[in-house]
């Protein structure tokens, strides 16, 4: 889908497909575009200092509502860690809370805990508080959920999650978002900025493959920004999902158009095949 992003100064055109790669050396421009997209679909009110981010986004000349996408953006290692922790408003806490409230077996377990606490408090009131005048102990069942909020995430060896590799953090955050949005019906856009500064080339290939597979079977789409040579994955199926951001923004055309152009304009002594075309 082609997005036309218009602010007071300029109009931009980007293609959003399955697993998008934004390459090129203009990191500032890429960050600005992604921040504009994230702010727009956040539905948050623009503040005075958001002037550069304020925009309107269209597709096929129709204005997209600000709730069209649910956007998740990761900018750093610290953000990857923070969302896997259980804390107020973290993705992990939302996921676990939703599961606790929706799983029958979990609710049965919570009721059993409530029954046991009721017996404990009954004993305390009968044996310890019987001599007090009009005073009893009790508990609020809603406070049981505080136990979950106070839980701690560890790796399978019992170590703090700060021992997880960046690759594991990125993969787990992707899987967490998949679980969170599985039945939401939302169109989901997951953004990883400067992922080439976090992963090796081989690790990035695995994450890109995971993103591609998920975009084929779920409501999730991805944007990865890259600036280091050799990271961008190019094949005849993903050409249109590559955006080059240097002085200008260039969305690559479909593979067959590139092939036809090269055949018409390159010297005839070059042996043209798919492998040569992709590598060059």
Listing of model-derived features with the role each one plays in the protein:
Residues 100-170:
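Conserved P-loop NTPase mechanochemical-coupling segment
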Residues 31-35, 199-207, 232-237:
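A short acidic (Asp/Glu
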Residues 1-69, 86-107, 111, 278-280:
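Glycine-rich P-loop/Walker A and Walker A-like loops and their local beta1-loop-alpha1 context
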Residues 186, 212-279:
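The catalytic "switch" region of P-loop NTPases
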Residues 18-24, 186-192, 220-222:
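Generic beta-sheet signal
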Residues 13-17, 177-187, 215-218:
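Flexible, charged surface loops at secondary-structure boundaries
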Residues 23-27, 191-197, 226-228:
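Structural motif
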Residues 151-205:
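Conserved helicase/translocase P-loop NTPase motor core
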